[in-house]
Amino acid sequence: MSVVPIEPVSRVLLRDQAVTLIRSAILSGELPPGSVVKDSALAGRLGLSVAPVRTALARLADEGLVESKPQSHTRVTPLVLRQVRDAAVVVRAMHELAVAEAAPAVTAADVTAMRAANRRFAVAVATGDLDTALAADDELHEVLLARCGNGAVRATIDRFTPAVRRLERQRFAAAHGHGSVVLHERLISACANGDVAAAVSTTTEIWTALLSELEETPDERS
């Protein structure tokens, strides 16, 4: 009987766990913009060794969520308008492409799932539950990403979304979040009717509304 070798995966799993936990702390504001992060202190809080935490911080630096100064410190990246705008423009383009590819193939089940997600989103925005609002927003757009099936589009969105997530939290915390409910319903209706042009233009409007708020957001770079 052949023996299947056991692969050493624990280090990778710990690294991924550290990335998820630290990213969540940054996006939720638990680690606020500009705050200094020490790998040893984070490792202690997470119950991990320093090695996976350092690897995680390097990955989060690639995502633009932390920045390191050699021989100095690592800190949570301030909300820098140009960087957020650059990322948001890319994410908008990818969502437009995903909708263009997905809309002609949307099923009745897809429409039902999106409408259910938008109902959860509306309730969460109305009650100020930001985490649930963001999760419901992700679920709605995930239906179209899954239907699109373009791995490169998904990878690009996953790569740049963290850079704009903090701005999204500000949007959904304000009255602007209520406008997203209406835009979502327009998007869903366009997909249900097979109106690709309307679905894409509504997606553009959703992201343009977010980009317009950059003009109202203070630059935290110091």
For every predicted segment, state its role.
Residues 1-100, 104, 211-222:
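Short linear motifs at protein or domain termini
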Residues 84-87, 114, 133, 137, ...:
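Hydrophobic packing residues in well-ordered alpha-helices of helical domains and bundles
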Residues 90-103, 138-174:
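Hydrophobic, amphipathic alpha-helical faces that serve as interaction scaffolds
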Residues 128, 150-151, 194-195:
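Short loop-to-helix capping motifs
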